[in-house]
């Protein structure tokens, strides 16, 4: 066993590429993440009370779930759990989703991004830095897999859905200073799957998109699933879908189901919204992401 791995090697792009295999937890940042204030957030904790919750994340990580090489399609998805940017619902909106994607022949990477919200920063600011960094690191790692990465998407629930939207619309502006050569790789997702995404509407008017959401023709296609009785209004998903259509982005799909509430993840219910994984799979097939 080798113990003498230097810190520089541990965070080098070469080491990342070699070690990005199933079950490997990769730190995003070589040291403190950008903008972190030592002592602002307490020790990381994991709590299970019906829902497995992770809180106080200061050292964000990626956990790789690689599909069997006989099934692998070359498509990879970064998965972002929800939790109001306060905690992470890491199991039913994270680990379980990665395993489902593996069944489709899709590599999955679970992003444990920074929570809770940092003082004097937008709620999505630190998580967006983590997501942009993750996009580049996964692209680098995917070059060394038996089935090399060809398409990289992002999927998220609630606050994680907001993070998926922000990542898919903010790629033109990397929100941190370059760390290493991996940051030369694109942070633009090839597709996005926001599920009951939160915080999309302007806080003042509640009838238009938040001003920091910038939809252009360069945005990737989106798949949305939401419910009409969700406490997070479906209007945000609808407005982004319409903006994508207006911008000329092809291939997006929107589902608004009448019932189902919020926070269901992959859990089966009696409501039609439980069909969203099948609809998402069909959408991915229509874009040839599962070929």
Each language-model region and where it sits:
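N-terminal cap/lid segment of alpha/beta-hydrolase-fold proteins
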Residues: 21-71
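Short beta-strand element of the alpha/beta-hydrolase
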Residues: 73-82
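Catalytic nucleophile-loop/oxyanion-hole region of alpha/beta-hydrolase
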Residues: 89-90, 96-97, 113-149, 270-273
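Short amphipathic alpha-helix adjacent to the substrate-entry channel of hydrolases
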Residues: 91-109
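Primarily recognizes the serine-hydrolase "nucleophile elbow" in alpha/beta-hydrolase
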Residues: 129-217
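Short beta-strand/loop motif that positions the catalytic acidic residue
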Residues: 223-226
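Conserved alpha/beta-hydrolase "acid-adjacent" motif
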Residues: 231-236
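C-terminal catalytic histidine-bearing segment of alpha/beta-hydrolase fold enzymes
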Residues: 238-241, 246-291
């Amino acid at each position: 066993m080798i113990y003498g791995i230097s810190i520089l090697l541990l965070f080098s792009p070469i080491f990342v590429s070699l070690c990005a295999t199933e079950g490997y937890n990769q730190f995003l940042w070589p040291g403190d993440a950008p903008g972190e204030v030592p002592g602002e957030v307490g020790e990381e904790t994991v709590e299970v009370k019906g829902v497995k919750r992770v809180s106080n994340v200061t050292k964000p990580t990626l956990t790789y779930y690689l599909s069997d090489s006989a099934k692998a399609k070359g498509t990879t998805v970064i998965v972002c759990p929800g939790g109001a940017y306060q905690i992470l619902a890491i199991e039913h909106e994270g680990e379980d989703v990665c395993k489902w994607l593996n069944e489709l022949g899709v590599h999955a990477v679970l992003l444990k991004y920074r929570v809770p919200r940092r003082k004097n920063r937008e709620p999505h600011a630190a998580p967006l830095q983590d997501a942009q960094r993750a996009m580049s690191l996964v692209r680098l790692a995917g070059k060394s897999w038996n089935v090399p990465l060809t398409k990289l998407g992002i999927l998220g629930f609630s606050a994680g859905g907001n993070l998926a939207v922000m990542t898919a619309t903010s790629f033109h502006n990397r929100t941190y200073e370059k760390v290493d050569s991996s940051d030369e790789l694109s942070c633009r997702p090839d597709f996005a799957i926001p599920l009951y995404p939160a915080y999309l509407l302007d806080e003042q008017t509640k009838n238009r998109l938040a001003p920091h959401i910038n939809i252009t023709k360069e945005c990737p296609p989106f798949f949305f699933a939401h419910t009409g009785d969700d406490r997070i209004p479906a209007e945000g998903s609808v407005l982004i879908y319409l903006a994508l259509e207006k911008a000329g982005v092809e291939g997006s799909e929107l589902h608004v189901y009448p019932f189902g509430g919020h926070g269901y993840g992959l859990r089966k219910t009696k409501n039609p919204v439980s069909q969203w994984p099948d609809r998402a799979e069909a959408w991915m097939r229509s874009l040839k992401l599962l070929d």
